[in-house]
């Protein structure tokens, strides 16, 4: 009645999943603490969130020391050098955002528990994206990142600009998600698989080129929204201005980096060998993004909007290595290095903006007049971040731009050289608006002669120490900024014992894994010996007389 049929359970590598598991545990702890702690003791919530992020970074470090590439779920989830570097970036950036949020959220009378729960949920989505090697995994991780971010962008419920920020971000995000999902469905229809490696193998045959090109365009457009590339950037300035400042910093760095990570995975794995289909589109996208972003940033009078358009221009630089047919490993290394350095200097710039706003109550560029008179340290730190964003040596931004220029020029064709010229021109344009803000701080007098000091919370001071230290360290130590093979894709394998461990006389052979069986009902009717055998041949027909 029942037949035994083999069922193979998936193998889980708990060490590889440890960063995400720690984050999930932190989510639960923060939510329970917010539920049961009295109102006066909820100040511990940012500490719990920060400790959880640092705790998640510990298994990232142990996995890096272990050095083994790991894969799970049929290759849909990989832990390699690329994934580990990006997980570390997301966790450290998230920790800095928690530091920036500590006093801002407490003093603004916001719901702290829900805020940190949503922030950690979004960071969890980013860590999953770093390991995603499958269309479904990428999409689910993007939604896990985006849905909490929509809510965080509109966190200031009683502010008109805050409501506008949340609404614009949500509506544009839903549209981009639909476009991206349609492109992914076309890829699945052509390849018959959601694994990026399988898609790359099928697309290499060169068949169904029109459908493949359409799928690539839809996917790039969908990710173009996530990274605020022109012309899909229109949500960014208004959202950045209306969202809480720590969330603005978070969206401008971590969220954008996650979008670039997913785009790089798709292009360099699934679209490998399809340069003719996507690189002309990406070339135009990169050139327009950096040029329009810089030109509009020149006209801004609000420092947050200026940094928003600066982020648009920086996105063009990060797209550049993908837009030319150069060395894939060098392009990937340049992108990851740029993302890491950009995170440090941009988060630092937003930390200074928050510190100055505590005194001036304004985000206008004119409110930065005379910062050097009442806080030389803040003015000096902002100068470091601004000139690093402009790519002035010997700061980290210089190294980031050098790696991108090198990856582009190494492609060695006219398209690459043309894009390098566009990048050089835009670097000069960007220096103009960064220098204008620096001039306000160092050369203009303080408004109304007010030179009273800025009172900075310890959390913002800690964020400034971390970001400034990394920005300077990446600049003076090129070996630290050039991630090289630390950011390369690799062919992940399941974790196995090393040869030395296997050959050891003390090694105990592991028993073969148990194969559970599932009882499947046998739908065939029971055998009855009194019934004729259905497999026996039919008897020969005999003539039967018919009586009229």
What is the role of each PLM region?
Residues 1-548:
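Alpha-helical transmembrane segments of multi-pass membrane proteins predominantly involved
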